[in-house]
């Protein structure tokens, strides 16, 4: 049995085929880049119909090349926190708000949760612009057209493709409206959002499986009999794909953005363990949660620096970074895109310090990259407090794969913990497939975890 793994991210849509051993089939990959609208006013949106077209293009490409012939299951890793308003016909009334969008703010006349700590413990989130409790009223006020209901981007896309497209437990937890214990919409969170149950997606039961609508079964006949598994949040998928599936290992992932996360078994309808005040908690599925912190900055800082600072190319840049002494980096506030919850800094809050006429582009880059490392430390300590022991750290993500120097910098900052590098290139797809197959326990064997690079040149010594 082959598995089609879809990665519905913010910057790209990807589809790849995995074999029965959850290994990528060579060559069976299609990818389309997504055009985001990002502005200094905090805008971070994308076009839902354009996104759907990119997904269709990926499926067309894989189908035309014969890669879908033996696919029996579709697994999905999807961005958390996106939302768009829909009309009575189920079509978008405006663009999709992604996690990047920092514009939504509560009404000055609206009070927040009656007991903020209890709200945080129950939903794993805060009354914050990243979550639907703040986003939905803001969307209503700015839409200009009456909104019939709201959906995440993945629910909208699947509603066009499948005969049925309820919201998975994992995706629902990212809205901030879900009670993580009872796995139903939280009444207080819904009241803050100004919605009733009928304006929200239906929640998927644990055994839900979808199938293509007849028109798309004819378009992709080799997928006609495939079962579609509930989507899981991309962060949860990355943890599983990294082999970080229990309380002994934390995943630090740096892609476009960055995050530190710990996965734990916490079945539904069982009281949840206490949650530290600065951390969020979302669902992987009905049996597991992922706890952690996420940051707006990661590989996007490198992309900005590469575009603006005229950096050396490839190997020359890596060599220049290794040649720096620890004091050569420049201090940086890396909140270029603002804060993710629970912080409230807006986009445009980044700063560079310690500049002189002798400061080099490589020194500026090193300061930015160290800033990404250092933001993880306090939140990792908070995660460790929930398990009362130091954890092993597994680095992963595209930005980590691209820079041995950055991996070594992380190892130095996070010492004396053991820090290793997950070399598997498809951690999100692999994680989603493992969850869909009920094989989370196999994740460690598949993760291909190796040692980090020499720490001495990029560490804190």
What annotation goes with each model-predicted range?
Residues 193-206:
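A conserved helix-loop-beta module that forms one wall/lid of the active-site cleft
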Residues 47, 101, 234:
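Short, conserved phosphate/pyrophosphate- and ester-handling motifs at nucleotide-, phospho-/glycolipid
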């Amino acid at each position: 049995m082959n598995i089609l793994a879809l990665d519905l991210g913010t910057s790209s849509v990807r589809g790849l085929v995995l074999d029965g051993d959850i290994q990528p089939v060579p060559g069976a990959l299609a990818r389309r880049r997504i055009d985001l609208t990002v502005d200094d006013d905090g805008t971070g949106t994308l076009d839902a119909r354009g996104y759907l077209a990119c997904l269709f293009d990926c499926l067309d490409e894989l189908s035309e090349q014969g890669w879908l012939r033996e696919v029996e299951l579709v697994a999905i890793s999807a961005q958390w926190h996106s939302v768009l308003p829909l009309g009575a016909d189920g079509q978008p009334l405006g663009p999709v708000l992604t996690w990047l969008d920092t514009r939504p703010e509560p009404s000055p006349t609206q009070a927040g949760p009656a007991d903020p700590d209890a709200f945080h413990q129950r939903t794993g989130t805060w009354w914050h612009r990243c979550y639907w409790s703040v986003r939905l009223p803001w969307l209503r006020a700015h839409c200009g057209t009456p909104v019939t209901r709201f959906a995440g981007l993945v629910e909208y896309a699947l509603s066009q493709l499948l005969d049925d497209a309820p919201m998975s437990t994992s995706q629902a937890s990212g809205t901030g409206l879900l009670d993580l214990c009872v796995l139903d919409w939280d009444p207080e969170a819904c009241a803050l959002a100004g919605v009733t149950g009928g304006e929200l997606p239906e929640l998927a039961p644990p055994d839900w499986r979808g199938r293509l609508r007849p028109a798309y079964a004819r378009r992709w006949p080799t997928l006609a009999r495939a079962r579609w598994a509930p989507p899981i949040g991309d962060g949860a998928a990355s943890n599983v794909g990294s082999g970080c599936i229990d309380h002994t290992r934390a995943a630090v992932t740096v892609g476009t953005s960055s995050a530190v996360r710990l996965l734990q078994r916490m079945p539904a309808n069982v009281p949840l363990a206490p949650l530290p005040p600065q951390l969020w908690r979302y669902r992987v599925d009905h049996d597991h949660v992922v706890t952690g912190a996420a940051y707006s900055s990661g590989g996007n800082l490198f992309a900005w620096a590469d575009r603006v600072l005229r950096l050396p190319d490839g190997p020359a840049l890596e060599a220049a970074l290794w040649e720096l002494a620890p004091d050569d980096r420049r201090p940086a506030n890396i909140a270029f895109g603002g804060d993710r919850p629970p912080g409230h800094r807006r986009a445009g809050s980044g700063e560079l310090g310690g500049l002189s006429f002798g400061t080099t582009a490589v020194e500026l880059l090193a300061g930015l990259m160290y800033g990404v490392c250092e933001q993880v430390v306090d939140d990792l300590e908070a995660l460790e407090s929930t398990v009362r022991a130091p954890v092993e750290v597994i680095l992963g993500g595209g930005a980590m794969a691209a820079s041995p120097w950055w991996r070594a910098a992380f190892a130095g900052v996070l010492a004396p913990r053991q820090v290793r590098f997950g070399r598997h290139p498809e951690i999100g797809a692999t994680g989603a497939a493992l969850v869909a197959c009920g094989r989370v326990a196999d994740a460690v064997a598949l993760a291909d975890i190796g040692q980090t690079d020499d720490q001495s040149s990029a560490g804190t010594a």
